[in-house]
Structures are given as C-alpha cells and as structure tokens.
Amino acid sequence: MATTVHRRVKGKATTWTGYHRILWPTDFSPRAKAALPHAVGLAKEANAELVLLHVLPSPGAYIVPDMAGAAWIPLLRKGRAAAQAHLRRLEKQMAGPHLRTHTVLTEGVAFHQIVRAAKRLRCDLIVLATHGRTGLAHAIMGSVAENVIRRAPCPVLTVRPPRFQSGV
C-alpha cells in the first residue's frame, strides 16, 4: 500500500519522498553508538546514504597559555588521525551492498558543526544520541542534542541509550 506523506516546512506544504541522506554524529562513546543501529536501519530501509560525522573540539580548546602552541600541533595531528581511523573502522564494519556510507571529520563546537554539516550535505534526517539529562546537570552542561534540535534544517531523531536495570 503506497502512502503519500505531506509535511509543512516554514509554512509550505511539501510532499515527502523519503530519506536520501541521513546524518549520524558520533563522539565515539557507547551512548552515541546506541543510536547507530537506528541510523543504519533507516538508511537501509530508505536506500539512503548514511553520513558518519565526528566533530573534534577546536584546537584553541587545547592550548594552554603557558605552553607554546607549536608543542600541541603533533598531538592535535595524532588526535585527528585517530578520529579519522576510527571513522573508517566504523564505516568498514557497516560495509555492505545495501548501505552507502560517507565519513566527515570536522572541528569546532559540536552542535554548530552538526547543523552546518546537515545543511551543507542536504541531510534529510539526523539520528543523534542523547544523555537525557535534566535539572541541574542539564542547566550546567547544556545539551548538544537540544541545540541541534532547535537549529537543524531537517528532522532529528534522538535516541536515549537503555537505562541500567538492576536485577533486584
């Protein structure tokens, strides 16, 4: 049974033709990886390209005023190389005939770069893990997911990892 989905985007009614490009931002944490099966499943089902994105903090975040900036350059290069290698490993693990993937490594403020990549790459969906923080923890640390949701040019699917359950 075929259905047509209509959605309203900034006052305009459009016909939804499915996902073509899905963005999965990762910080390589187990929490972020909990969202990966959702992104992969949606990409396979829609025959969409899956973009794996990692955002490195800006180099300025690492520079200590008492140290020469040049001393940090080799460390930053190693960090960039390690992140690129990790993205490639993830991409290789997902390789298959029914999934097209693409990796992007960038640097800056995470939520800014996620939104920027979604716009630049014309992504139809962002699949993003969330901590689900509330109260004081949320007020102090903020939320990458919340900032992405507020600014994203496309829908955002947030995935909260399973909670720990005691056997008691």
Task: State where each predicted segment sits.
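A short acidic, glycine-rich active-site loop
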Residues: A70-A85
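Short, hinge-like loop/turn segments at secondary-structure boundaries
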Residues: M67-A71, R120-L121, V144-A145
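Glycine-rich, Arg-bearing micro-motifs that act as flexible, cationic patches
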Residues: L125-N147, P161, Q165-V168
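Small/aliphatic-rich secondary-structure junction motif
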Residues: G11-A70, L99, F164
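General small-molecule cofactor/ligand-binding pocket signal
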Residues: V51-L53, H102-T106, L157
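Structural beta-alpha unit
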Residues: M1-T17, R31, K92-I126, R163-V168
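Short, well-ordered secondary-structure micro-motifs
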Residues: A35, Y62-P65, V115-R116, H138-I140, ...
